[in-house]
Curated annotation (Swiss-Prot):
The protein, known as: DNA polymerase sliding clamp
GO molecular function: DNA binding; DNA polymerase processivity factor activity
Keyword terms: DNA replication, DNA-binding
NCBIfam families per the UniProt record, alphabetical: PRK01115.1-5 (NF002222)
Superkingdom classification of source: Archaea
Keyword Cytoplasm among UniProt keywords: no
UniProt keyword DNA-binding, yes or no: yes
Biological processes per GO annotation: leading strand elongation; regulation of DNA replication
Source organism of this protein record: Natronomonas pharaonis (strain ATCC 35678 / DSM 2160 / CIP 103997 / JCM 8858 / NBRC 14720 / NCIMB 2260 / Gabara)
InterPro entries: DNA_clamp_sf, Pr_cel_nuc_antig, Pr_cel_nuc_antig_C, Pr_cel_nuc_antig_CS, Pr_cel_nuc_antig_N
PROSITE patterns noted in UniProt: PCNA_1
Binding partners and assembly: Homotrimer. The subunits circularize to form a toroid; DNA passes through its center. Replication factor C (RFC) is required to load the toroid on the DNA.
Function: Sliding clamp subunit that acts as a moving platform for DNA processing. Responsible for tethering the catalytic subunit of DNA polymerase and other proteins to DNA during high-speed replication.
Length: 247
């Protein structure tokens, strides 16, 4: 059983954060809220989403797992105006999700969860640097790097206490430095890793510009990015594997 009412903004933000990496996913339901964990087909980008029951206007479930086509569900939720409420009701016999918003009624066929790729484990990494940065600054760095290259280096200079971004193209380069004053917080350590810009651009689309993003970095390690949404009732963790640099 699953019945819920939630604002279209909150549900849309949750779906966006996952759909930038995968087209379908398992949604785990329990009394505390819903969780989604998924990895893209190339095993490069991972997302872990938690949406607390307190993010909903009302929320009832006796637990379970459903499989969802994210593109179709996003299209439906996208029909709602900002601030409108979306009503969700799972029909367990037909395995369909009934969605109603502003007089519109949709019935969404669900996917067998067993046919969806197994959820990944979220590795426990000991990363040397932690940067707390505004979503708008990540957007600026990604946009600048995208003008010259298809990959981006993220690093920390512990001596200068700076977070930096490097992008090197065939002819042009971009370098951006943010010191402690430009950041919300910085725990410096030796860190530099190279990443695919395509993945970072996709993740950036789902990061609110006013979000406080906690970024964890190491030396040729994955980057972890955490941020809250829905007034703290939603939490997203992204992890992106590095590109291995050949000498």
């Amino acid at each position: 059983m699953f019945k819920a009412i939630v604002s279209a903004d909150t549900l849309g933000a949750a779906l966006d954060s996952v759909s930038v990496l995968v087209d379908e996913c398992k949604v785990r339901l329990d009394e505390e809220g819903l969780t989604i964990r998924a990895v893209d087909p190339a095993n490069v980008g991972m997302v872990d989403l938690e949406l607390s029951a307190s993010a909903f206007e009302s929320y009832e479930t006796d637990g379970g797992v459903i499989g969802v086509n994210l593109d179709r569900l996003e299209d439906i939720v996208g029909m709602a105006d900002s601030g409108q409420l979306v009503h969700l009701d799972l029909d367990e016999e037909t395995r369909k999700l009934h969605i109603s918003l502003d007089g519109l009624e949709y019935t969404l066929a669900l996917i067998d969860p067993d046919s969806i790729r197994q959820e990944p484990d979220l590795p426990d990494l000991d990363l040397s640097s932690e940067i707390v940065i505004e979503g708008a600054d990540i957007d600026r760095a990604v946009t600048a790097a995208d003008m010259v290259s298809d990959h981006i280096a993220l690093g920390v200079d512990p001596d200068a206490e700076e977070f930096y971004v490097d992008a090197e193209g065939d002819t042009d380069d971009v370098h951006l430095e943010l010191d402690r004053e430009d950041l919300i917080d910085l725990t410096p350590g030796e860190a530099r890793s190279l990443f695919s810009l395509d993945y970072l651009k996709d993740m950036n689309k789902a990061i609110p510009k006013d979000a406080e993003v906690t970024m964890e970095l190491g030396e040729e390690f994955p980057v972890k990015m955490h941020f809250d949404f829905a007034e703290g009732d939603g939490h997203v963790t992204y992890m992106l594997a590095p590109r291995i640099q050949s000498d």
